[in-house]
UniProtKB/Swiss-Prot annotation:
Major localization listed first in the record, in broad terms: other
Protein source organism: Entamoeba histolytica (strain ATCC 30459 / HM-1:IMSS / ABRM)
A molecular-function term among this protein's GO annotations: cysteine-type endopeptidase activity
Described function: Cysteine protease which degrades matrix proteins such as collagen, laminin and fibronectin and thus is involved in the destruction of human tissue. Can abolish adhesion. May play an important role in pathogenicity.
Subcellular location: Lysosome
Gene this chain is encoded by: CP1
Enzyme Commission number(s) from the entry: 3.4.22.-
Keyword terms of this UniProt record: Disulfide bond, Hydrolase, Lysosome, Protease, Signal, Thiol protease, Zymogen
Identification of the protein by name: Cysteine proteinase 1
Propeptide feature ranges: 14-93
Enzyme class: hydrolase
Pfam families, A to Z: Inhibitor_I29 (PF08246), Peptidase_C1 (PF00112)
Length: 315
């Protein structure tokens, strides 16, 4: 038994060195010992989960050497009150499955880094997708500026790298438009708003999907990408690798939502109907940046507060 445990730790210790190299991490000797211990702790969580669940966890991802508390400090979606906005009932028959990636209407996965700017990435991913669907363009080259929204939406209620809401991003874009990434590149840190950038795209408004209504959310996704918010606080989400994700620990009430992402489709995974959700933590997390979240029971709140831009246009 001792030999097995020793081999287990040595094995994951070797993996820790690989993880450090793959993720370009640089630790002092003391910090490296601490991170290795956390990595080994997470490796035990992975092994236990993967014996019990059909969805898989991994220590390959960017948060493998973080405690769950450290990881949670990165989740900075701000909820200050019940949001208002038009709820549009589409009342259409949605197809059984939709995946906008297969239609070339989803831009590449982005990485928000250590900046609490998920609210910009979720909302802008939905906008980019809707532009491609409604106005055309190249999904590989279309890249709107998250930096523009991080630095310039404070007067709309956001707080830079310390969190915000996608609805505030849409309010800003309605009035001022949004620049291209090449004109206002992402830094992952707080700075002042530049007034010299040219807007590249704009929206007329945005709609909310009826809360906790999975039929209406499917209808909305069948017409384009949708900005959604979730409770991403559990260690299972932190270490997610693949499969149909369900989580008994996560919550789905409005004030528990702490991370903004983007739904790009839905379909069946491992025999379970799932939302296809795009994250903003790079391609090293999850299924090359995506997670399949089980629809039944509103897993982690995907259907709690969805919204999407309308009247999208290039300028």
């Amino acid at each position: 038994m001792f030999t097995f445990i020793l081999m287990f730790y040595i094995g994951y210790g070797i993996d820790f060195n690989t993880w450090v190299a793959n993720n370009n991490k640089h630790f002092t000797a003391v910090e490296s010992l601490r991170r290795r211990a956390i990595f080994n702790m997470n490796a035990r969580i992975v092994a236990e989960n993967n014996r019990k669940e059909t969805f898989k966890l991994s220590v390959d991802g960017p948060f493998a050497a973080m405690t769950n508390e450290e990881y949670n400090s990165l989740l900075k979606l701000k909820r200050s009150g019940e949001e208002k906005g038009e709820v549009r009932y589409l009342n259409i028959q949605a197809p059984k499955a939709v995946d906008w990636r297969k239609k070339g209407k989803v831009t590449p996965i982005r990485d928000q880094g250590n900046c609490g700017s998920c609210y910009t990435f979720g909302s802008i991913a939905a906008l980019e997708g809707r532009l491609l669907i409604e106005k055309g363009g190249d999904s590989e080259t279309l890249d709107l500026s998250e930096e523009h929204m991080v630095q310039c939406t404070r007067e709309d209620g956001n707080n830079g790298c310390n969190g915000g809401l996608g609805s505030n991003v849409y309010n800003y874009i309605m009035e001022n438009g949004i620049a291209k990434e090449s004109d206002y590149p992402y830094t992952g840190s707080d700075s002042t708003c530049r007034s010299d950038v040219k807007a590249f795209a704009k929206i007329k408004s945005y709609n909310r999907v009826a809360r906790n209504n999975e039929v209406e959310l499917k209808a909305a996704i069948s017409q384009g990408l949708v900005d959604v918010s979730i409770d991403a606080s559990s260690v299972q989400f932190q270490l997610y690798k693949s499969g149909a994700y369900t989580d008994k620990q996560c919550k789905n009430n409005y004030f528990a939502l702490n991370h903004e992402v983007c739904a790009v489709g839905y379909g069946v995974v491992d025999g379970k109907e799932c939302w296809i959700v795009r994250n903003s933590w790079g391609t090293g997390w999850g299924e090359k940046g995506y997670i399949n979240m089980v629809i039944e029971g509103n897993t982690c709140g995907v259907a709690t507060d969805p919204l999407y831009p309308t009247g999208v246009e290039y300028l």
